[in-house]
Amino acid sequence: MGSAIPQVITPDRATGAQVIDGSLSFFKESNPYLEFTPGSDGNRSTWTISFWALVDPATTGTYNPFTLATSDSFAWEYEGLMYAGNTLYYIDYISQASGSNILWRTNAHFRDTGWYHFMAVKVNNSTFKLYVNGEEQTSLSNSTNNNGQSSHWNKSGEKMFLGGSTHATGYSSHSPGMSQFYFIDGQALAPADFGFTDGLTNTWKPKKYTGTFTGTNTCYLPFDGNSPIGQDQS
């Protein structure tokens, strides 16, 4: 498991922005991760993932997962948001039996080491959106719609990971920090629900989510050091 390490994401209390005073670190050397296995299906067609993460574009490795949902039945059935070097990916291997898979790769690249806000939003079985710092990523390579398939996320018995996994592919993370993780079951939310553009600095800042925490598997993990790691605060 990781440990809570005090960090600050762009502190600027004078602007009235939410200040995040904690994060959870994941380092490859110890292969840490958080794991949850749903006991029942949530909404597999509509959900929102939102979190802040510290990214180093010089990080090595094929894929470094922020989030991953996996099938225990087939080694190559998994879905998750990850990055390799300076590029963000969302990969969904739908079926090992059929060989079908989906890959979204952003053409925009991480230039600087720093905190970024990420969102993955499944609107329905034919619409999926990626956001970085409030901006939808519409310039994508190898992008394919998910052909009406339900998600690995929110499926009873399929493990949901943060920061790494025990998956057969062996993917592990190297993120110096992750904070303010939300998984909202059954809602396709917008960046404005979690952040805003600061008029004084023209930068994307975190905002406290004030919406509803509906759904079977919804959770909120602040990683602020004020509650046990992995304990849902929704």
Located regions from the model:
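Low-complexity Ser/Thr/Gly/Asn-rich repetitive segments
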Residues: F196-D198
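Phosphoinositide system proteins, centered on phosphoinositide phosphatases
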Residues: Q233-S234
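Extracellular glycan-associated modules
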Residues: G2-A4, T10-L189, L200-G230
